[in-house]
């Protein structure tokens, strides 16, 4: 189990949203590069970056902040938000991003995921965000009629490196991740699952470690480490004990 610290970018700053609502944002740091370096210093092994403005606009919006992050760390990075075409993927990989996350475009155009995996082997992750089990897209503003499991199954065999599963109702709410839904998704597919949304305590991490054998390989944390509810170094130490 790998603990993955998150940096969510809005207007060039590190923010956290509640349940994906852009108007419910809290700025934690106006220097994303410094924040990235701090998470690496505390032992972060991978950094998760989201271009929130990009997710809503459908195109990259925080390029200078993303460049600053990449220059500030030596650990691998993964980035999502507004990635809708091959040219954007190429641009981010050239910048030094390790893996890109396809979200809305994966639901709207599954063939794009297949094409991206063929062109950039090992570099593509699919982000599936769900509300009450149903996939939500366009920065979570639109809930579709397809379940998370149905969508994830479409990518089996494409070469997707991982599925990041976010339960929107838990995100930023500090109520614990949806263990049951995360486990069910991981058991239903043959792609590794990274949990996201709601992590609030070391007990939550223990609960995720307990379902690791189902195919849950990591967890993304944002608000919990920014607010101090979880100490990142302690959380990483806990997972390393289990390895």
Swiss-Prot record:
Name the chain's protein.
1-(5-phosphoribosyl)-5-[(5-phosphoribosylamino)methylideneamino] imidazole-4-carboxamide isomerase
Q: Which reaction does it catalyse?
A: 1-(5-phospho-beta-D-ribosyl)-5-[(5-phospho-beta-D-ribosylamino)methylideneamino]imidazole-4-carboxamide = 5-[(5-phospho-1-deoxy-D-ribulos-1-ylimino)methylamino]-1-(5-phospho-beta-D-ribosyl)imidazole-4-carboxamide
Q: Which PANTHER family match?
A: 1-(5-PHOSPHORIBOSYL)-5-[(5-PHOSPHORIBOSYLAMINO)METHYLIDENEAMINO] IMIDAZOLE-4-CARBOXAMIDE ISOMERASE
- Report the main location listed first in the record: cytoplasm
InterPro entries named among the record's database cross-references: Aldolase_TIM (IPR013785), His_biosynth (IPR006062), HisA_bact_arch (IPR006063), Isoase_HisA-like (IPR044524), Isoase_HisA-like_bact (IPR023016), RibuloseP-bd_barrel (IPR011060)
Q: Which UniProt keywords apply?
A: Amino-acid biosynthesis, Cytoplasm, Histidine biosynthesis, Isomerase
Biological pathway = Amino-acid biosynthesis; L-histidine biosynthesis; L-histidine from 5-phospho-alpha-D-ribose 1-diphosphate: step 4/9
* Entry's Gene Ontology molecular function annotations: 1-(5-phosphoribosyl)-5-[(5-phosphoribosylamino)methylideneamino]imidazole-4-carboxamide isomerase activity
The answer to whether the entry has keyword Cytoplasm is yes
Q: Kindly indicate where the leader peptide sits in this chain.
A: none
Q: Which family does it belong to?
A: Belongs to the HisA/HisF family.
Q: What is its EC number?
A: 5.3.1.16
Q: What class of enzyme is it?
A: isomerase
**Which residues act catalytically here?**
8 (proton acceptor), 129 (proton donor)
Return the GO cellular component terms, semicolon-separated.
Answer: cytoplasm
* GO annotation, biological process: L-histidine biosynthetic process; L-tryptophan biosynthetic process
Q: Which Pfam families match?
A: His_biosynth
Per its UniProt entry, which superkingdom is the organism in? Bacteria
Localization, per the record, is: Cytoplasm
The species is: Citrifermentans bemidjiense (strain ATCC BAA-1014 / DSM 16622 / JCM 12645 / Bem) (Geobacter bemidjiensis)
